[in-house]
């Protein structure tokens, strides 16, 4: 069928087209089926229907299809039905609880990267693996396929070090300290990080305050070899692109299949050529890992997968029931990290966690003896070498190396949340703290967030400030404060949690 082209300048993340229902019926295709579009080149796209947006005799091409055809643009194209990709049958096999071969996983990942699958099909695969976990072999094959799906860094100098946090703890700004500590001791650590999806600030959101974070793989390699380390946004690279596409579908489903989590973490480490990796596994209430037993199982699985991939993986189970440090939100966290680098002043939880994990990497990289890594990490902070290295990293990424914590701006609108009575902080709710910080504008508003005056186990008196909320916009501050007062993110010993009034039948 010959159809006239109508471009639609909307990005949908897939090869998609729109047909009028009359033409779709004539072609014999249903919504979600595929069609082949042919002019001087040929591609396959997923079909959407309309009764009035596109007239009969025309085909609407979304941005991605238009771009793919733009070099050989014609006013009309030939459209005919196409078979479903083989991956749809592979997904059905997974749904039936059958095991996949390496070749089938390679085909599936290729189709995901090349946008040949609809989101509902990817969702079916993720749900199937959530219910029926993959075997060790399948998880290894999935990880290798994800590594091979994009760019890879190949360094001439080794070892290559890396660190990853499972997440779930607000204020986890430790990469801003770990990377310069490790690089200052002569090791290479090309740290690719994420932006916050559900949190109040990912490492990339924080580093972006100090320097650009969007670089391609070649630039990351060059900068790392020159100064020893970088702190960049992984989403700007073509490193393990299949992972980003899977995460995009996982998010609205609120699921994180175990095998996918393992593959996601290790694919990014494999793609940057990591030899030694330290995994931070926060455990406790409000984290992804509820208890030590779950943490140990995850650690064993990560170590096992690393061994299969030729990576040396060490895991640290860390305390995750309260925030790291006393700040949540990009600018506030950067200030706290810079203070530690500049003067070794800061919360014990931030210094201890950063030095412990950096120390593990220093020992794995053989620049510190057994059980001596922590001491070397602390010394690197105290003697200013970590700060000097961090300035080099900021400079090579295009930032101002002379920046200090005093130069970082925070939200101008603030309000304290006070203690309702005398006592001790018994508990802090990580998820509520993040919700409140996001209501205040974090992470998009860099100056928004929370400063904690008290943490778990610390005493206070009625009327003392427990936390200060910062916002760049007054309306966002009001929303955050209202939420914090209605449902406080902390419990003070002796405070009333809720009043339930009596009622009378009428």
From Swiss-Prot:
The lineage of its organism: Archaea, Methanobacteriati, Methanobacteriota, Stenosarchaea group, Methanomicrobia. Gene3D superfamilies: 1.20.970.50, 2.40.40.20, Nucleoside phosphorylase/phosphoribosyltransferase catalytic domain (3.40.1030.10), Pyrimidine nucleoside phosphorylase-like, C-terminal domain (3.90.1170.30). One of its GO terms (molecular function) is 1,4-alpha-oligoglucan phosphorylase activity. It catalyses: AMP + phosphate = alpha-D-ribose 1,5-bisphosphate + adenine; CMP + phosphate = cytosine + alpha-D-ribose 1,5-bisphosphate; UMP + phosphate = alpha-D-ribose 1,5-bisphosphate + uracil. The active site is at 256 (proton donor). GO terms for cellular component: cytosol. Belongs to the thymidine/pyrimidine-nucleoside phosphorylase family. Type 2 subfamily. PANTHER family: THYMIDINE PHOSPHORYLASE. It is an enzyme of class 2 (transferase). Catalyzes the conversion of AMP and phosphate to adenine and ribose 1,5-bisphosphate (R15P). Exhibits phosphorylase activity toward CMP and UMP in addition to AMP. Functions in an archaeal AMP degradation pathway, together with R15P isomerase and RubisCO. AMP binds at residues 168, 194-199, 203, 264, 288. Keywords: Glycosyltransferase, Transferase. Its EC number is 2.4.2.57. GO terms for biological process: AMP catabolic process; pyrimidine deoxyribonucleoside metabolic process; pyrimidine nucleobase metabolic process. This is AMP phosphorylase. NCBIfam families: AMP_phos, ARCH_P_rylase, PRK04350.1, PRK05820.1. It comes from Methanococcoides burtonii (strain DSM 6242 / NBRC 107633 / OCM 468 / ACE-M).
């Amino acid at each position: 069928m010959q159809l006239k082209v109508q471009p639609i300048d909307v990005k949908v993340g897939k090869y998609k087209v729109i047909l009028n229902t009359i033409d779709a019926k004539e072609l014999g295709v249903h919504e979600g089926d595929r069609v082949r579009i042919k002019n001087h080149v040929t591609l396959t796209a997923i079909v959407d229907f309309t009764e009035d947006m596109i007239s009969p005799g025309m085909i609407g091409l979304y941005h991605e299809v238009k771009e793919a055809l733009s070099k050989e643009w014609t006013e009309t194209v030939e459209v005919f039905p196409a078979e479903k990709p083989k991956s749809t049958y592979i997904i059905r096999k997974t749904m039936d609880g059958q095991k996949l071969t390496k070749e089938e996983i390679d085909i599936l990942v290729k189709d995901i990267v090349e946008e040949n699958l609809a989101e509902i099909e990817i969702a079916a695969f993720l749900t199937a693996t959530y219910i029926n976990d993959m075997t060790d072999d399948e998880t290894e094959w999935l990880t290798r396929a994800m590594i091979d799906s994009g760019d890879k860094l190949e360094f001439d100098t080794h070892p290559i070090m890396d660190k990853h946090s499972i997440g779930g703890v607000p204020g986890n700004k430790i990469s801003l300290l770990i990377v310069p500590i490790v690089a200052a001791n002569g090791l290479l650590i090309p740290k690719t990080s994420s932006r916050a999806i559900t949190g109040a600030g990912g490492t990339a959101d924080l580093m972006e305050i100090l320097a650009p974070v969007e670089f391609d793989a070649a630039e990351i390699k060059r900068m790392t070899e020159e100064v020893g380390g970088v702190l960049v946004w992984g989403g700007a690279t073509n490193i393990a692109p299949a992972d980003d596409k899977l995460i995009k579908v996982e998010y609205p489903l609120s699921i994180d299949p175990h095998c996918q989590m393992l593959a996601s973490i290790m694919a990014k480490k494999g793609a940057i050529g990591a030899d030694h990796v330290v995994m931070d596994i926060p455990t406790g209430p409000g984290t992804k890992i509820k208890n030590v037993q779950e943490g140990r199982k995850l650690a064993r699985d990560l170590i096992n997968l690393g061994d299969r991939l030729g990576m040396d993986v060490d895991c640290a189970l860390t305390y995750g029931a309260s925030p790291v440090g006393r700040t949540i939100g990009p600018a506030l966290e950067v200030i706290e990290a810079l203070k530690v680098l500049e003067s070794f002043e800061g919360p014990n939880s931030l210094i201890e966690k950063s030095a412990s994990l950096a120390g593990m990497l220093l020992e794995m990289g053989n620049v510190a003896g057994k059980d001596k890594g922590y001491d070397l990490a602390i010394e690197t902070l105290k003697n200013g070498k970590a700060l000097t290295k961090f300035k080099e990293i900021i400079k090579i990424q295009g930032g101002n190396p002379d920046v200090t914590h005093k130069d970082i701006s925070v939200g101008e609108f603030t309000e304290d949340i006070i203690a309702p009575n005398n006592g001790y902080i018994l508990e802090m709710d990580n998820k509520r703290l993040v919700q409140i910080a996001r209501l205040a504008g974090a992470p998009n508003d860099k100056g928004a967030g929370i400063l904690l005056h008290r943490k778990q186990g610390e005493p206070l008196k009625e009327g003392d400030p427990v936390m200060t909320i910062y916002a760049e916009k007054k309306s966002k501050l009001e929303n955050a404060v209202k939420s914090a007062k209605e449902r406080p993110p902390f419990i003070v010993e002796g405070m009333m949690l809720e009043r339930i009034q009596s009622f009378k039948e009428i």
